[in-house]
């Protein structure tokens, strides 16, 4: 049949077909199908799927498909990837969807990386790590053995852990190998801090000392406190060392000369923590880049100027109860923007720019949680039995890890958090190394470490 004649015939039969009842149309189709060969049946099969099952991801413009995908949760998206190769291709190409999914899990996102497949892989890795945290399978434990008396001073930095003991020694350990890098003879250690060249110790003998790792020699001795020195901090740029003591004072020393520059008074309890830190916000009293001195006792946190004036005045005192009915837990977090401390009422977070309380995070199901680390996304907490991870966005505990019966000092010197960058968001690389360390009754050090990804 010629093309023109065929078109005329097709128009006529179409008019007739449209005039039929539904039953007659069905009978007509059945008859035509019975007369069809393999080519016609294949054609019918291919076109029926498009007519009866509208594949919107295939038919819509890519921008509209991406917009619709943003309304689905990640688990549904992964299921949708199994529908067809086309769906998997479209869903796997939506960068924003997978970046958002990673952010919602507390992952750090580099917006400059726009490779959607990369972020999908990151999400799959992230969901595995979060499942391990939920199932108590993300960590493993180890021990450091070498001291012969109680260990009451710990400090961690860049994969190295320093331990100070009543056996008149301090040791520096490589956490990854468990090997002792340095061991030197000291006085009794109540507090320690170190860098590559030196170790600074606060002692129960009321003094502070500076030691050289390579030779073990004492290079400086700071005398002046009349009580045990419970906390030390120093800054080489300022050439300043600060110490907090059981004599209720904070002393500021010349690090290189060993002379006392100032004695800060005002505390009425043991000073258990001193912190030297750069300010990162502008306030009425400070500018970004200014160095700040914080000191804490059982009830109060005091903020001081860094100066050499005699009778230096405290700039601000923070507390959680005016009548001193609520104690602060050991461990103080200050990152230049926020001050965070735990108490029986919960975690208190102060804005350093205004000194206002930003929020109080309560954990009614678990009382008296002590603070170990605080970040943008997560907080690391613990009590006598467990180590906890809190998602600060929801203020819910997302993981816990059992702890042995460890030696918990009231000053908070015998336990600490390890690597802290993951508290600002995991990134697939920073969940390695030390999570937590504490001294044990048998004088060993108990370590909790990230387990490698399965």
UniProtKB/Swiss-Prot annotation:
The keyword Protein biosynthesis does not apply. Residues 54-101 form the F-box domain. It comes from the Eukaryota. One of its GO terms (cellular component) is cytosol. Transmembrane segments: none annotated. The keyword Repeat applies. GO terms for molecular function: ubiquitin-protein transferase activity. WD repeats lie at residues 139-175, 179-213, 217-255, 259-306, 313-352, 364-403, 410-452. One of its GO terms (biological process) is proteolysis. Pfam families: F-box-like (PF12937), WD40 (PF00400). Keywords: Acetylation, Repeat, Ubl conjugation pathway, WD repeat. The modification N6-acetyllysine is found at residue 298. Gene3D superfamilies: 1.20.1280.50, YVTN repeat-like/Quinoprotein amine dehydrogenase. PROSITE patterns: FBOX, WD_REPEATS_1, WD_REPEATS_2, WD_REPEATS_REGION. Signal peptide: none annotated. Substrate-recognition component of the SCF (SKP1-CUL1-F-box protein)-type E3 ubiquitin ligase complex. Directly interacts with SKP1 and CUL1. This is F-box/WD repeat-containing protein 2. It comes from Homo sapiens (Human).
């Amino acid at each position: 049949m010629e093309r023109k004649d065929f078109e005329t015939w097709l128009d006529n039969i179409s008019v007739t077909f449209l005039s039929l009842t539904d039953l007659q149309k069905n009978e007509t189709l059945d008859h035509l199908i019975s007369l069809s060969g393999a080519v016609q049946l294949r054609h019918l099969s291919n076109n029926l799927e498009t007519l009866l099952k509208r594949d919107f991801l295939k038919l819509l413009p890519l921008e509209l498909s991406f917009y619709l995908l943003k309304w689905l949760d990640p688990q549904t998206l992964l299921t949708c990837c199994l529908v067809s190769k086309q769906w998997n291709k479209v869903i796997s190409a939506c960068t924003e969807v997978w970046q958002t999914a990673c952010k919602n899990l507390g992952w750090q996102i580099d917006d400059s990386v726009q490779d959607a497949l990369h972020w999908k892989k990151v999400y799959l890795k992230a969901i595995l790590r979060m499942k391990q945290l939920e199932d108590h399978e993300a960590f493993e434990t180890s021990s450091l053995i070498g001291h012969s008396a109680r260990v009451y001073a710990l400090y961690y930095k860049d994969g190295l852990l320093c331990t100070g003991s009543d056996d008149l020694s301090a040791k520096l350990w490589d956490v990854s190998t468990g090997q002792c890098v340095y061991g030197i003879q000291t006085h009794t250690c109540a507090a320690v801090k170190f860098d590559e060249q030196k170790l600074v110790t606060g002692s129960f003998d009321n003094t502070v000392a500076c030691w050289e790792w390579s030779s073990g020699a004492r290079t400086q001795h700071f005398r002046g406190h009349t009580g045990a020195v419970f906390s030390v901090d120093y800054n080489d740029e300022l050439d300043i060392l600060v110490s907090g003591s059981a004599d209720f004072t904070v002393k500021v020393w010349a690090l290189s000369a060993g002379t006392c520059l100032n004695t800060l008074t005002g505390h009425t309890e043991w000073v258990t923590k001193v912190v030297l830190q750069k300010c990162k916000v502008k306030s009425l009293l400070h500018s970004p880049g200014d160095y700040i001195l914080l000191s804490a006792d059982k009830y109060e946190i005091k903020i001081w100027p860094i100066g050499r004036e005699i009778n230096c005045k405290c700039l601000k005192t923070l507390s959680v109860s005016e009548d001193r009915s609520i104690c602060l837990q050991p461990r103080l977090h200050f990152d230049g923007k926020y001050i965070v401390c735990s108490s029986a009422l919960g975690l208190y977070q102060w804005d350093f720019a205004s000194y206002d309380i930003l929020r109080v995070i309560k954990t009614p199901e678990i009382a008296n949680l002590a603070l170990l680390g605080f970040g943008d996304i997560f907080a690391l907490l613990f009590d006598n039995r467990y180590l906890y991870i809190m998602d600060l966005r929801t203020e819910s505990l997302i993981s816990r890890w059992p702890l042995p019966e460890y030696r918990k000092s009231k000053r908070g010197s015998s336990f600490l958090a390890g690597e802290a960058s993951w508290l600002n968001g995991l990134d697939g690389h920073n969940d390695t190394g030390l999570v937590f360390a504490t001294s044990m009754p048998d004088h060993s050090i108990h370590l909790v470490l990230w387990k490698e990804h399965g």
